[in-house]
């Protein structure tokens, strides 16, 4: 049986991230906060053994990769989507200048964003890069890839069969968030999603729910026999109806949380599996009128 593990790391905060403007293949450097995030990442990654380390050739990813202190290959295939004329604009400016494109984006219609790349072009590029990486790893091999939010999210959406959804159920990548996948022949296991617990609280980027959203913190308790929050599903429905724009905490056994994570991702192929989170672990789920989104799902580091 072939077993491989790949850890994807979104780059640390860039100057464009801090300014709240679109960045695609423009080469925005790391911000002061981003450099501090790299230090936090270094403490977690520096003693981890990897058979292969790759980064996008854009400086915000390449400079984040320096946290490993080892030789890291640079590969253009791992670049962010090219957003063309959207580059350097705020969201409000994009909505004002390209209203038709924003509608097409929400409806998941194929078009070249800002005259740059289309999402199907990015999917093909990301899938090809991942296939090439897997082909280079030895049996039991581990790789780490420093790349971009759009690339990581598009790979995950492809694996769970949700590329036509808006928003993607496993999206909204945090700076230096780690997403780890284990490949066992045709089966894929999600070991961690968007894990930034290596950062101090002041360097993390908590999601602030909009008035039409509820942020649900899912805490793992006991085994299947432990009921956790009484009537788990009703608690989430009640939160959605009464706590809009707020945060609610619920608890459940690890099996139920893994099932909820899988349900959030939609009709997941049988070969994709969410591993069950450990006792005391907290995950985050965003609920709105649209498709729910899993913001955070992390497990202890698992060696293979």
Region spans (language model):
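Short glycine-enriched, charge-decorated loop/helix-capping segments at active-site entrances
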Residues: 21-29, 89-91
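Short glycine/proline- and acidic residue-enriched helix-loop micro-motifs
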Residues: 101-121
